[in-house]
Amino acid sequence: MTKLIIHLVSDSSVQTAKSAAHSSLAQFTSLKPKLYHWPMIRNSELLKEVLSNIESKHGIVLYTIADQELRKTLTKFCYELKIPCISVIGKIIKEMSVFSGIEIEKEQNYNYKFDKTYFDTLNAIDYAIRHDDGQLLNELQFADIVLIGPSRTSKTPTSVFLAYNGLKTANIPYVYNCPFPDFIEKDIDQLVVGLVINPNRLIEIRETRLNLLQINENRNYTDFNIVQKECLEVKKICELRNWPVIDVSTKSIEETAALIMRIYYNKKNKYNK
């Protein structure tokens, strides 16, 4: 079979480019593709890393990037290397603009429906729901990503966000003085990421939750020393196993998920070399 390298470059989650790539590859049964994912490329420093990899691993480039300067840099670089650089929805947007007489404002995301990517996303969402909050730990081998962290560190919404981007994500809470699942003693292929937060901020979030639930007695849940120990213990667990840790104190769900996706795809790209 003929090998084909495809670089998927996006300022978002690469799902649009990935969907287009899979739909196109379905027309070629004799091709053996190797896809490199480059999500959340939103500045020149991140793009430099991508360009370096494109230079060392020549292949077709599919991109969805809204920033004009980044697009110019990418297309010029590929032109000089004499490799195809294709805007996945650029032609469509241009024709819509010409036909309607309305100027282009920005590139919008879109999805091909009912292709492999669509069903991968549905499966990932189902997986995230069934493996929320430490459920079905015997099925962690089917995950792409495992999140660990104290309660209320945005593990569940981050898992769902990642699932909407096609990544099967399980999450496991860490509770002070409770035994942690023995999976941490094993070598696993999945990306494990620890989520921590400023203890004072976490106490605020937990107190708000207790008030909403009208629960008055749960001292350990909002005790500063215990909350601090929970975060420190998660850091310790991750550092001992070289698992990345993300402080979510000032990050939105999207920002946290973007960091995790970047780590995940960097790891995947590394093993695809």
From Swiss-Prot:
What family name appears in the similarity comment?
Belongs to the pyruvate, phosphate/water dikinase regulatory protein family. PDRP subfamily.
Q: Which UniProt keywords apply?
A: Kinase, Nucleotide-binding, Serine/threonine-protein kinase, Transferase
Chain segments annotated as coiled-coil in the UniProt record:
none
Instruction: Name the reaction it catalyses.
Output: N(tele)-phospho-L-histidyl/L-threonyl-[pyruvate, phosphate dikinase] + ADP = N(tele)-phospho-L-histidyl/O-phospho-L-threonyl-[pyruvate, phosphate dikinase] + AMP + H(+); N(tele)-phospho-L-histidyl/O-phospho-L-threonyl-[pyruvate, phosphate dikinase] + phosphate + H(+) = N(tele)-phospho-L-histidyl/L-threonyl-[pyruvate, phosphate dikinase] + diphosphate
User: Would I find Transferase among this entry's keywords?
Assistant: yes
Q: Which domain of life is it from?
A: Bacteria
The name of this protein is Putative pyruvate, phosphate dikinase regulatory protein
| Enzyme class, spelled out | transferase
InterPro entries in UniProt: Kinase-pyrophosphorylase (IPR005177), PPDK_reg (IPR026565)
EC code? 2.7.11.32, 2.7.4.27
The organism encoding this protein is Rickettsia bellii (strain OSU 85-389)
Does Nucleotide-binding show up as a keyword for this record? Answer: yes
Protein role: Bifunctional serine/threonine kinase and phosphorylase involved in the regulation of the pyruvate, phosphate dikinase (PPDK) by catalyzing its phosphorylation/dephosphorylation.
Q: Which GO terms describe its molecular function?
A: ADP binding; ATP binding; phosphotransferase activity, phosphate group as acceptor; protein serine/threonine kinase activity
Q: Which residues bind ADP?
A: G149, P150, S151, R152, T153, S154, K155, T156
